[in-house]
């Protein structure tokens, strides 16, 4: 009898995907529309994600161009960006909003690299929690022969190691992107 690790694989993969979503929101020195994913605009009385009220393009390496679908939302878009924690100053010409992405200081890059490490650690903790849950399930299964239990524990550990390694690679890639000028 083999122990089914499908649920564990899905949950560990979910931790990696959550990490990638979080890291996409951390801005680098280049313009990336993903940094605006968390910005919500008050549009007709409801908080609406920015990408649902405007198109976002990257005409140059350090410029984001935000074109509202409805010109009446322009002021709300500017306000939403100003109150966000992005630290960017939007410039509006009445039709579009330009966002110049400033060059990051070395200090800010290191600060963001620490944030990347913290997010990676959260993902690793999540993976380890899945491992702990599976190990507990294996120990609770009294019908499972000892050899099968040992094999299932080894498979779980191997799966955990693979996911931790993948998380480290994702974080290292983002850190490299941040620290490269």
From Swiss-Prot:
GO terms for biological process: translational termination. The keyword Protein biosynthesis applies. Its main location: cytoplasm. InterPro entries: Ribosome_recyc_fac, Ribosome_recyc_fac_dom, RRF_sf. Residues 135-160 are annotated as: Disordered. The keyword Ribonucleoprotein does not apply. Keywords: Cytoplasm, Protein biosynthesis. It is found in: Cytoplasm. SUPFAM superfamilies: Ribosome recycling factor, RRF. GO terms for molecular function: ribosomal large subunit binding. It comes from the Bacteria. Signal peptide: none annotated. One of its GO terms (cellular component) is cytoplasm. Responsible for the release of ribosomes from messenger RNA at the termination of protein biosynthesis. May increase the efficiency of translation by recycling ribosomes from one round of translation to another. Belongs to the RRF family. This is Ribosome-recycling factor. It comes from Leuconostoc mesenteroides subsp. mesenteroides (strain ATCC 8293 / DSM 20343 / BCRC 11652 / CCM 1803 / JCM 6124 / NCDO 523 / NBRC 100496 / NCIMB 8023 / NCTC 12954 / NRRL B-1118 / 37Y).
């Amino acid at each position: 009898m083999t122990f089914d690790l499908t649920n564990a694989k899905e949950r560990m993969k979910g931790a990696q995907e959550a990490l990638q979503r979080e890291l996409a929101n951390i801005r680098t020195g280049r313009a990336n529309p993903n940094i605006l994913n968390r910005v919500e605009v008050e549009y007709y009385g409801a908080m609406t994600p920015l990408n649902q009220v405007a198109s976002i393009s990257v005409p140059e390496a350090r410029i984001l161009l935000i074109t509202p679908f409805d010109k009446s939302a322009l002021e709300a878009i500017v306000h939403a960006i100003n109150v966000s924690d992005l630290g960017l100053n939007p410039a509006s010409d009445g039709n579009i909003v330009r966002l110049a992405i400033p060059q990051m200081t070395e200090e800010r890059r290191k600060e963001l690299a620490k944030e990347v490490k913290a997010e990676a650690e959260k993902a690793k903790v999540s993976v380890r929690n899945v491992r702990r849950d599976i190990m507990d399930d294996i120990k609770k299964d009294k019908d499972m022969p000892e050899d099968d239990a040992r094999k299932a524990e080894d498979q779980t550990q191997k799966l955990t190691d693979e996911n931790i390694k993948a998380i480290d690679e994702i974080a290292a890639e983002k850190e490299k992107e941040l620290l490269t000028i």
